[in-house]
Regions:
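Glycine-rich ThDP/TPP pyrophosphate-binding loop and its adjacent helix/strand module
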Residues: 84-85, 137-332
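Prokaryotic Sec-type signal peptides and long signal-anchor helices
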Residues: 6, 10-14, 244, 333, ...
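Intrinsically disordered, low-complexity serine/threonine-rich segments
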Residues: 7, 15, 301, 307-311, ...
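Intrinsically disordered, low-complexity segments enriched in small/polar residues
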Residues: 7, 24-25, 132, 283, ...
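Short, Lys/Arg-enriched N-terminal segments with co-localized hydrophobic residues
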Residues: 1-29
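Thiamine diphosphate
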Residues: 29-183, 326-327, 331-391
Length: 391
């Protein structure tokens, strides 16, 4: 029997701890100087790969990848649980890029994280038949959770996935066996949160108190053809508070330290759906286009690409990944392997105690219909004409 009842007393307790090392100062989770430098290098590598991909294609959106480099570095470098060898791993966290036009941000991060995306694939951005289409496609690219592009759609996708994880948790989690305790993280921009679909989905998430949902709001105050203030005067923070979200604001979304501190605090405890306001600069690092709508959806141009790399202090070599970044993500992959083994050991013990439930979970992972559901569907009957709302 499938139940969609919501349990308001349910508390989310994170099962995994991704913090490479942490110290506290004034209540903050701190990075040491080496870690600051390393995460900044990861952020700039995401930027470099992204603007090179857009420039080679002579088409795309460099603004978001440049503006969200630190967010990407902390997500894949510390926060998210993922398994490049199994994109449907039960224990993984889910990342959705609602602002799908910024797809080179996602492709660059997936490449660094060890997914089946090579440098050659990045070089084929927006080319027919490539693994790197202009907007993320679920069936084309390993590591892409859902197809996105229409602004705001990814927010609704994320709410649906978060609800799905909650339902699975209520069905299958047992004391000592937190099989489904996944975080669902969605990155959305000003344009996404102007769309009606994001309003409706967010309201629903707040109503259900989906405390596994994290909405990262890339607030750069820029839209496709001008300033956000030209077409919208919503108080987004107050709107989300009215939905029932908790709100955290990162004053400088281009600060590794601030992004890390905010996200790792969330990892420790979350009681409601969460809006994380990341105040970023669109096109960060571009000397002549940063902070303007001109960097949103057009290649920088060869001269500006070079100027941006010089301003960021990174190699001018195209599609360059520093050795230190490669080593960091190799170590990260080893950590993820240990977490995979940890989960598999737990699931093995779960299977001994809950054999039938474990079998159902395996079928779900393999996209098979559970026997109970198949049997229930076979016995459904309808009158000849029934309104859809009554089915």
């Amino acid at each position: 029997v499938f139940s969609l009842e919501f349990f308001p007393g349910f508390k989310y307790n994170t099962y995994y701890n991704n913090i490479p090392s942490k110290a506290r100062k004034g209540g903050k989770i701190m990075l040491n100087e080496y870690q600051k430098k390393l995460f900044k290098e990861v952020a700039n590598t995401i930027r470099g790969l992204s603007i090179d991909g857009v420039q080679k294609a002579n088409s795309g959106h460099p603004g978001l990848p440049l503006g969200c480099g630190e967010i990407g570095a902390v997500l894949w470098g510390a926060f998210l649980n993922y398994d490049p060898s199994d994109e449907e791993a039960i224990w993984r966290d889910h990342f959705i890029l609602s602002a799908g036009h910024g797809s080179m941000f996602l492709y660059s991060a997936l490449h660094l994280a060890g997914y089946n995306l090579s440098i050659d694939d990045l070089k084929k951005f927006r080319q027919r038949g490539s693994k790197t289409p202009g907007h993320p496609e679920k069936l084309d690219t390993e590591g892409v959770e859902v197809t996105t592009g229409p602004l705001g759609q990814g927010v609704a996708n994320a709410v649906g996935i978060a609800l799905g994880m909650k339902i699975l948790g209520e069905m299958y989690n047992k004391d000592g066996f937190p099989i489904f305790e996944n975080k669902v993280v969605v990155l959305a921009g000003d344009g996404c949160l102007m769309e009606g679909i994001s309003h409706e989905a967010s309201s629903f998430a707040g109503h259900l108190c989906l405390n596994n949902l994290i909405l990262l709001y890339d607030r750069n105050h820029i839209t496709l053809d001008g300033a956000f203030s030209d077409s919208c005067s919503d108080d987004v923070v107050m709107r989300y508070k009215s939905y029932g979200f908790d709100v955290v604001e990162i004053e400088d979304g281009n600060s590794v330290e601030q992004v890390y501190d905010a996200l790792m605090r969330i990892k420790e405890a979350q009681e409601k759906p969460l809006l994380v306001v990341c105040n970023t600069v669109i096109g960060f690092g571009s000397p002549h286009k940063a902070g303007t709508h001109n960097v949103h959806g057009s290649p920088l141009g060869e001269e500006e690409v070079l100027a941006t790399k010089r301003a960021l202090g990174i190699s001018e070599e195209k599609f360059f990944v520093p050795a230190g970044v490669k080593e960091f993500f190799n170590e990260r992959k080893e950590l993820m392997k240990k977490k995979k083994i940890h989960f598999e050991d737990m699931f093995s013990n779960y299977q001994k105690s809950y054999q039938a439930l474990a079998a159902e979970i395996k079928k779900l992972k393999d996209h098979s219909i559970p026997h109970a559901l198949k049997k229930a569907l076979q016995h459904l009957s309808f009158e000849e004409k029934v309104a859809g709302r009554k089915c």
